[in-house]
C-alpha cells in the first residue's frame, strides 16, 4: 500500500561511508504560510478582511504542510497525458492526471479558492486574493482552473437561465473530476478558449463561426490555439455569429447526454506549469449556448478576463514571496564561518 507522503516519511541517511552530511537546512515544510507573512497579514487587515484571519491561518498551515509539498512535487513530475482515443479507436479527448493533481484540486476548491469571492458575506474579494496568493505558493498550476472558474461567474450571470445551472456548482466548493453531464455533478470548473493561430491576442481576427439552431442554441466550427484546462466542464469562447463576434458557453457534454464535438488536438509542451494542462482544440460542430448579445462577445467575455488578470498579478507576487521565504529559511539554518548565513554582513 502506497504511503500518503512517502518522501516525508523517510528519514534521510546522513552518515555515509565516505563522509557525514551536516550543515543542511531542514525541509521548508510544516510552515504556516499566512502567519509567517507579515505583509500579507497586514494587507488583509487593512483591506477590511480581518474577519477571515482564522480561516486564512488554517489554510496557510495546509499550504505550507509536508503533504501539500509532496502533492505539488508529484503533480509536476507526472504531468497530464492526453487520451484522444480508446483502444477501439473511439474518440475520448480525455486528460489523465496524477492522483496528486486531483488531491491539490480537491484541497484548493474545497477551501474556496474558486468560490469564496462570491460566497463570503464580507470582503469576499480580499479573501479570494489571499487564498489564491497562498495556493500559488503551494502549487501554481492548479490555480489556473480555479482562477477561470472564479472569473467565469460574472460573465455567466449575463445569461440568468444559463447561470442557474452552473452557478450552484461553481459556488459549491466541491471538486468533481468525473467526465459526465454537469446536471449529474455537484461541482463544476470552467475554462476559457479565445486565441486562434492567425490572430493571437487580436481576437477580432478569429475565424471560428457559429450557426444558430432552431431551438436557440448554436453550432460552432473552428479552432482555438490555446485552451487552458481542457478537462473543464465548460468553456467560455468566442465565435462569429450573424450579428458579429459573440461569446458562447461550450459544455463538454451536450444536453442529450452525448460528448460535445470538442476535439483536443494536443497538449502544449511548456517550460513550466507542468501540473496544469494547456491545449489546442477544434470545434467540429460543437453545441453551444450564447452568453450576452450577438456582436458583443468581447465586452461579454472581458468580464471573465478582468477577474483572471487579478490572479495573473497575484501569481508572480506569490512566486517571489515563496522564493524569499525559502531563501530566509535556508540562511537561518546554514552556517558559514562560524555564523548563520542570516547573521553575515551581506544579510544585515
Language-model features: where?
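Glycine- and acidic
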Residues: 130-140, 150-154, 192, 218-221, ...
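A glycine-rich, basic-preceded beta-loop-alpha segment at the flavin cofactor/substrate interface
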Residues: 256-258, 280-308, 325-343
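Internal helix-loop-helix
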Residues: 91-181, 227-229
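Internal maturation/activation junctions in enzymes
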Residues: 162-208, 212-216
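Extended, charge-enriched "interface" segments that sit outside catalytic cores
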Residues: 2-121
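Flexible, small-/acidic-enriched active-site or ligand-binding loops
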Residues: 258-284
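A short core secondary-structure module
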Residues: 217-261
Amino acid at each position: 500500500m502506497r504511503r500518503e507522503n512517502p518522501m516525508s516519511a523517510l528519514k534521510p541517511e546522513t552518515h555515509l561511508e565516505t563522509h557525514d552530511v551536516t550543515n543542511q537546512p531542514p525541509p521548508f515544510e510544516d510552515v504556516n504560510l499566512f502567519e509567517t507573512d507579515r505583509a500579507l497579514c497586514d494587507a488583509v487587515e487593512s483591506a477590511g478582511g480581518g474577519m477571515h484571519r482564522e480561516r486564512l491561518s488554517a489554510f496557510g498551515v495546509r499550504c505550507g504542510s509536508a503533504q501539500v509539498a509532496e502533492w505539488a512535487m508529484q503533480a509536476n513530475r507526472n504531468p497530464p497525458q492526453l487520451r484522444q482515443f480508446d483502444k477501439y479507436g473511439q474518440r475520448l479527448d480525455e486528460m489523465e492526471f496524477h492522483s496528486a493533481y486531483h488531491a491539490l484540486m480537491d484541497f484548493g476548491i474545497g477551501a474556496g479558492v474558486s468560490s469564496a469571492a462570491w460566497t463570503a458575506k464580507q470582503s469576499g474579494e480580499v479573501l479570494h486574493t489571499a487564498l489564491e496568493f497562498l495556493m500559488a505558493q503551494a502549487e501554481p498550476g492548479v490555480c489556473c482552473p480555479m482562477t477561470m472558474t472564479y472569473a467565469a461567474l460574472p460573465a455567466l450571470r449575463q445569461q440568468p437561465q444559463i447561470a442557474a445551472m452552473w452557478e450552484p456548482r461553481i459556488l459549491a466548493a466541491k471538486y468533481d473530476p468525473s467526465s459526465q453531464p454537469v446536471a449529474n455533478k455537484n461541482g463544476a470548473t470552467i475554462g476559457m478558449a479565445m486565441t486562434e493561430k492567425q490572430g493571437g491576442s487580436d481576437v477580432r481576427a478569429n475565424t471560428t463561426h457559429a450557426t444558430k439552431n432552431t431551438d436557440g442554441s448554436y453550432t460552432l466550427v473552428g479552432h482555438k490555439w490555446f485552451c487552458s484546462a481542457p478537462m473543464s466542464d465548460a468553456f467560455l469562447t468566442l465565435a462569429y455569429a450573424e450579428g458579429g463576434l459573440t461569446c458562447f458557453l461550450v459544455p463538454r457534454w451536450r444536453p442529450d447526454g452525448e460528448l460535445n464535438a470538442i476535439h483536443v488536438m494536443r497538449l502544449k509542451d511548456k517550460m513550466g506549469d507542468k501540473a496544469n494542462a494547456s491545449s489546442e482544440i477544434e470545434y467540429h460542430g460543437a453545441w453551444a449556448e450564447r452568453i450576452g448579445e450577438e456582436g458583443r462577445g468581447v465586452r461579454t467575455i472581458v468580464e471573465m478576463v478582468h477577474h483572471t488578470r487579478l490572479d495573473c498579478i497575484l501569481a508572480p507576487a506569490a512566486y517571489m514571496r515563496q522564493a524569499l521565504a525559502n531563501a530566509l529559511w535556508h540562511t537561518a539554518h546554514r552556517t558559514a564561518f562560524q555564523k548563520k548565513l542570516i547573521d553575515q554582513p551581506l544579510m544585515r
